[in-house]
């Protein structure tokens, strides 16, 4: 394949109606260069060295008296801005546009003769060397801007990007395919179309979400990956919903036809998995429908060895977008070094395929696009392809969006948008070429709107004519792109009509041969759907011990700063207190310091850490201070980049004000780099429910559905402290509802040392079959609570404990109170004021998996026990009560009374008034500590 493109030198900018003034300034420049602004000095220097420019400008200027130039400039500007409204981008059922701006020569009282007398340089700053006059140039622009590709870029604020696009679009360029390449492209389309037709005929009514109508998507992806291969990009991450997914799996990831057809026949597809290991397909024990599944292909089919990944995706359209971005960034980051990661955007690229109804309809897209240029999230430019079949299930565009195009919402992110006719396959290839060039040049997103149609209903059981009869009258009569392109090649003499039909038949023959290999009796039989044995146990404690000197060395390093670095005095006093656990007998390690010490030891073990969230560098509650700021210069210093013997990176970023996209990004990052300790911290745990789709459809179910492992950790500040219903609850109950089959660990801690050991245990589980998400109901006021802070000897040895108790005299205990997190601390502090040896407080540090054995063993040691009580801050219908009740009920059986103390059932999580909160909280504590 060759690209014929005429290169031209840089020429002066448009002057339009100000041309006369510019010529006067040019004369001034010739007399005294310093008499004009610096930018014009540079421009006029170029003009001075090109004898052809000034005469052309002066000739043009003489015709300017009647406003001709002004009208020419308005015409040119309109073509660039609005030519897309008359572009030939609709294969069928073109919309009837109203109020289209003026776009014709006659609309501006211009004619051929007038335009032939004007320099082509007026039309575009690089046309003077290409066309004889403005008329020729305008004809070229009309053809370009009203052709099978509609370009939108004038909304971009960056002048360099806008100028690059203008020159790239307007410079004569044609993707020239030789005959062999045209035949190869036709064969690609024949395979795409033939696959769909075969399934449609042989598995009538089976859902497959056909690609027909936007078939060019597959050649576009193949072209993209080929260009990426030439550029040395060896990791391609693709995200898409279900439309066309089976075709992408078979023709981009090269999943064998036998495997795909086996899934339609409900037989075991894995017997047809390539033995060379080039195709990785993971599976969970519950499984998922075939059009949600992804895979990873290692192949050199596109010119170099590449890893092509199609992400697993639920039916929640578009939610995979941030996951793909996170996976891409993980592939780009080098984390096996001290300090911060280095990011090479040339290592990997994301391709995200959207639907035209879902793209403007789902806010996750805009959260994700907002990540595009942020330091902590950029992937060097994503290629977005809208598979625009101009319908969403039964909803037509007039009811689906408030804009002209589904892509209009992308304009706010300053990205170019190309609309391309899905029936013009060569135009779709050109759109990809320009998009990839732009990404390479500017490392920014590009959106391609592949405008086609949907051959059948939303799924193959659906009859679209019930709700959309008129469009489907024309769609049913419209030839497939395979036939459209095939006839074009026949007319060009590239292939004969017999060859065209012969190859179409050959595709069907290959599919039939694959079908015949499958034994219908080989049915899949897995009624028990058992989870892996590795998940039988809870997260295992990390029993590694540390010497006092080792932790002191780390602590000293974290409190050492560059010479001349000026820390705010108020903050410096806080940080200096972190020396006390090592030089004072009564010194205690608080929550933030425990975290810093844990992170440092994890980095020494060679596990990279990535922590993101709103305000996470400092911490919402001003406790972490992981990134320090010089109060005089504003420069930053990150102590965790300078840990002694550090073997992996520490990466921390304040996230944008987004939850869903950021959590999806971190999930994807961890799936791609399973060695990375990824942590997302909510500003308040209450806001975590903005990410509920990621929790439900990925984090807690991905391994069960897809065999996709994640060890993402969530820090969710949670405690009832009188701050109202939106700053109290991380909705603990929802995470406990999602907990099953040892798919996660959920904790609510009361000890800084237990937090230290928990973080180390989670880090140790990464990249193993034991890895799973960790949910931490993290503290707020407890961050500085001395009851939570612990002496350093609790950090030098031991491991994570699922339950904690104080010392007790077994025969005196008649009442056991089970509580968690801040509720446990409140009870402990209240009991300290009025000691009662008959009451034993037990901190349930790990809620899931529930520590039944540990509690049962404890209760067995108490011969005079009469009552077990569960105490919580949350309303009875929230928090942990409904989750723990079945477990505790079994433990107490008929031996002890079981009671509940907490807020009554409420619709809202907490009281809005701080004083009322205190009254309610104190009453709960008072009632709980009564020993009847």
UniProtKB/Swiss-Prot annotation:
Disulfide bonds: none annotated. One of its GO terms (molecular function) is thiamine pyrophosphate binding. Its cofactor is thiamine diphosphate. One of its GO terms (cellular component) is oxoglutarate dehydrogenase complex. PANTHER family: 2-OXOADIPATE DEHYDROGENASE COMPLEX COMPONENT E1, 2-OXOGLUTARATE DEHYDROGENASE. Homodimer. Part of the 2-oxoglutarate dehydrogenase (OGDH) complex composed of E1 (2-oxoglutarate dehydrogenase), E2 (dihydrolipoamide succinyltransferase) and E3 (dihydrolipoamide dehydrogenase); the complex contains multiple copies of the three enzymatic components (E1, E2 and E3). The lineage of its organism: Bacteria, Bacillati, Bacillota, Bacilli, Bacillales. Its EC number is 1.2.4.2. Belongs to the alpha-ketoglutarate dehydrogenase family. Keywords: Glycolysis, Oxidoreductase, Thiamine pyrophosphate. GO terms for biological process: glycolytic process; tricarboxylic acid cycle. InterPro entries: 2oxoglutarate_DH_E1, 2oxoglutarate_DH_E1_bac, DH_E1, KGD_C_sf, ODO-1/KGD_C, THDP-binding, Transketolase-like_Pyr-bd. This is 2-oxoglutarate dehydrogenase E1 component. It catalyses: N(6)-[(R)-lipoyl]-L-lysyl-[protein] + 2-oxoglutarate + H(+) = N(6)-[(R)-S(8)-succinyldihydrolipoyl]-L-lysyl-[protein] + CO2. The gene is odhA. The keyword Oxidoreductase applies. It comes from the Bacteria. E1 component of the 2-oxoglutarate dehydrogenase (OGDH) complex which catalyzes the decarboxylation of 2-oxoglutarate, the first step in the conversion of 2-oxoglutarate to succinyl-CoA and CO(2). It comes from Staphylococcus aureus (strain MW2).
């Amino acid at each position: 394949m060759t690209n014929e493109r005429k290169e031209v030198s840089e020429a002066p900018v448009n002057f339009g109606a100000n041309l006369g003034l510019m010529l006067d300034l040019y004369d001034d420049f010739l007399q005294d260069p310093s008499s004009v602004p610096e930018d014009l000095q540079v421009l006029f220097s170029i003009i001075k060295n090109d004898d052809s420019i000034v005469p052309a400008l002066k000739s043009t200027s003489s015709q300017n008296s009647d406003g001709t130039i002004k009208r020419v400039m308005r015409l040119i500007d309109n073509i660039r801005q609005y030519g897309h409204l008359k572009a030939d981008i609709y294969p069928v059922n073109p919309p009837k546009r109203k109020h289209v701006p003026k776009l014709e020569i006659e609309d501006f009282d211009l004619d051929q003769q007038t335009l032939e007398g004007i320099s082509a340089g007026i039309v575009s700053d690089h046309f003077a060397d290409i066309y004889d006059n403005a008329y020729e140039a305008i004809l070229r622009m009309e053809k370009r801007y009203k052709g099978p590709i509609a370009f939108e870029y004038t909304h971009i604020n960056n002048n360099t990007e806008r100028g690059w696009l203008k020159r790239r679009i307007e410079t004569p360029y044609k993707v020239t395919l030789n005959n062999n390449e045209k035949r190869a492209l036709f064969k690609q389309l024949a395979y795409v179309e033939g696959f769909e037709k075969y399934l449609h005929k042989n598995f009538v009514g089976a859902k497959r979400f056909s690609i027909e109508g936007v078939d060019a998507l597959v050649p576009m992806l193949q072209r993209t990956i080929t260009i990426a291969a030439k550029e040395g990009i060896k990791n391609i991450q693709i995200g898409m919903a279900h439309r066309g997914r089976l075709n992408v799996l078979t023709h981009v990831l090269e999943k064998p036809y036998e495997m795909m057809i086996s899934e339609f026949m409900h037989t075991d597809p894995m017997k047809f998995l390539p033995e060379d290991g080039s195709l990785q397909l993971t599976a969970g024990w519950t499984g998922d429908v075939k059009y949600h599944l992804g895979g990873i292909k290692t192949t050199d089919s596109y010119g170099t060895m590449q890893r092509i990944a199609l992400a697993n995706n639920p039916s929640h359209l578009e939610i995979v977008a941030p996951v793909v971005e996170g996976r891409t960034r993980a592939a780009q980051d080098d984390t096996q070094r001290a300090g911060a990661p280095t990011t090479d955007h040339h290592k990997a690229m994301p391709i995200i395929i959207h639907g035209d109804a879902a793209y403007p309809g789902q806010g996750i897209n805009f959260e994700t696009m907002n990540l595009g240029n942020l330091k902590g999230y950029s992937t060097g430019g994503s290629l977005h392809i809208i598979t625009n079949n101009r319908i969403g299930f039964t909803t037509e565009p007039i009811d689906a969006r408030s804009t002209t195009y589904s892509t209009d919402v992308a304009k706010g992110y300053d990205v170019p948008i190309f609309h391309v006719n899905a029936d013009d396959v060569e135009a779709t290839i050109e759109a990809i070429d320009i998009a990839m060039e732009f990404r390479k040049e500017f490392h920014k997103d590009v959106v391609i709107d592949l405008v086609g149609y949907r051959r059948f209903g939303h799924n193959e059981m659906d009859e679209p004519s019930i709700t959309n009869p008129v469009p489907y009258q024309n769609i049913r009569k419209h030839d497939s792109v395979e036939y459209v392109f095939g006839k074009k090649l026949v007319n060009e003499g590239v292939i004969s009509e017999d060859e065209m039909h012969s190859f179409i038949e050959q595709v069907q023959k290959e599919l039939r041969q694959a079908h015949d290999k499958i034994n219908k009796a080989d049915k899949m039989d897995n009624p028990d759907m058992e989870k892996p044995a590795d998940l039988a146990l809870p997260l295992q404690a990390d029993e590694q011990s540390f010497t006092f000197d080792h932790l002191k060395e780390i602590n000293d390093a974290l409190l050492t700063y560059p010479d001349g670095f000026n820390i705010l005095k108020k903050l410096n006093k806080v940080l200096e207190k972190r020396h006390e656990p090592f030089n004072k007998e009564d010194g205690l390690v608080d929550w933030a310091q425990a975290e810093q010490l844990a992170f440092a030891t994890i980095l020494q073990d060679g596990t990279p850490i990535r922590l993101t969230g709103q305000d996470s560098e400092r911490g919402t509650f001003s406790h972490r201070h992981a990134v320090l700021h010089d109060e005089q210069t504003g420069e930053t210093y990150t102590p965790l980049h300078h840990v002694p013997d550090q073997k992996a990176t520490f990466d921390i970023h304040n996230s944008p004000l987004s939850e869903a996209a950021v959590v999806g990004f971190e999930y994807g990052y961890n799936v791609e780099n399973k060695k990375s300790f990824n942590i997302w911290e909510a500003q308040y745990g209450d806001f975590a429910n903005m990410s509920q789709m990621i929790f439900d459809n990925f984090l807690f179910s991905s391994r069960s559905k897809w065999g996709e492992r994640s060890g993402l950790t969530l820090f969710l500040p949670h405690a009832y402290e009188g701050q109202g219903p939106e700053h109290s609850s991380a909705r603990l109950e929802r995470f406990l509802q999602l907990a099953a089959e040892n798919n996660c660990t959920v904790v609510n801690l009361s000890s800084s040392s237990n937090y230290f050991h928990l973080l180390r245990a989670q880090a140790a589980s990464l990249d193993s079959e034991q890895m799973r998400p960790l949910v931490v109901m993290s503290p707020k006021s407890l961050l500085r609570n001395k009851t939570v802070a612990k002496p350093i000897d609790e950090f030098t040895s031991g491991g994570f404990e699922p339950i904690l108790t104080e010392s007790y005299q077994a025969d005196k205990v008649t009442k056991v109170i089970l509580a968690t997190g801040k509720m446990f601390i409140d009870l402990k502090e209240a009991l300290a004021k009025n000691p009662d040896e008959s009451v034993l407080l037990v901190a349930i540090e790990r809620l899931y998996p529930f520590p039944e054995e540990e509690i049962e063993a404890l209760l067995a040691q108490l011969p005079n026990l009469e009552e077990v009580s569960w105490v919580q801050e949350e309303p009875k219908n929230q928090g942990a009560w409904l989750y723990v009740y079945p477990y505790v009920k079994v433990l107490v059986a008929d031996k002890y009374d079981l009671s509940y103390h907490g807020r009554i059932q409420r619709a809202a999580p907490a009281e809005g008034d701080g004083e009322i909160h205190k009254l309610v909280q104190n009453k709960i504590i008072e009632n709980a500590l009564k020993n009847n």
